[in-house]
Amino acid sequence: MNNFGDFLRKEISKNKLSQNKFAEKIGVSSYYVGQLIKGEKRPPSREVQLKIVDALDFNESKKIQFFDLIAKEKSDIPSDIYNGVMKNEEKWNEVREVLNKGEKNND
C-alpha cells in the first residue's frame, strides 16, 4: 500500500461509505477508486482531488494533509496552493519573492 492509498481507504471508511458509493459521489468508477487505494494508479487530477475533499467533507487540517500527501507522491505543488496562486496572477510574484529569499538565505 502507499501513503495516499492508505489515507484514502481510512477516510472512506471513517465516512461509512462503500467503495461504490464513494466512487459514485466523486464521479469515477469503483475500479478506479480501488486502483487508487492499492497504489496501482497515481493520485488523481486536481479536479478529482477537489471532489474527494467535498465528498469526504474534510476540515482544513485534513485538506492540507490530503493535498500534501498527493503533492509528495506526484512531485507536484499541493492543489490548494496551486489553485490559490493560479486564481491571482499578483500572487505569482509574491511566491517568487518568497522563493528567492529562501535561495538567498541558503547561500
Where are these regions (language model features)?
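Recognition helix of helix-turn-helix/homeodomain-like DNA-binding domains
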Residues: G27-P43, K51, L69
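DNA major-groove recognition helix of helix-turn-helix/homeodomain DNA-binding modules
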Residues: E47-I64
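Short, charged recognition helix plus adjacent turn
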Residues: K62-N100
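A short, Lys/Arg-rich alpha-helix, primarily the initiator
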Residues: M1-L17, R96-V98
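DNA major-groove recognition helix of helix-turn-helix
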Residues: I12, I37, V48
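Short alpha-helical "recognition helix" segments of helix-turn-helix
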Residues: K21-A23
